[in-house]
Amino acid sequence: MNSFPKIDVLAACAKYGPVLKVPTGLDGERIMASLASNESSTGNDCGPRHEPAYDVGGSVWASSPAQRALVAQYGRLGASSFGPWQLMLINYPGFSPAELEINLDDCARGCVSHFNSYVAHFEPKNLVEIGQIWNLGHKTVNPPAGVIRYCSDLQKAYDSAVKQPTSGVS
């Protein structure tokens, strides 16, 4: 299991969070920190975490030639998520599992890139919709129980997130 110090994850949120394309009234730094809280206990459990839907026989694997190629190239790691934001390799062409596993800055930039291209595409109106998109891949009026719990935990993490001082963050 890989991990990053919480203070470093929060510093990355302070550095990159302000460029997240978020709904009016929400704070990108706090959203980024909340996602890291939900996905990895803010860097404590960064995986890699196997995601069966992305592996041989899974729904994503079955429907995606690109995902099948990643599994063929990297085996189980091609179907795993990495880092404080649990990034799936398929969403980061050109990155290897090792790069997402050991480089916090690459992970943070990857989080912002995925958020601003994929999540923002769905035009979420609130934190619940952001949670649904990040966890489920889309918005829905009838989310499964696990997604409801994920969004509730995301809201709690957001409500308790404190913006980090910007001094000393490069």
Residue ranges and their predicted role:
Residues 2-169:
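Catalytic glycan-binding domains that act on GlcNAc-containing polysaccharides
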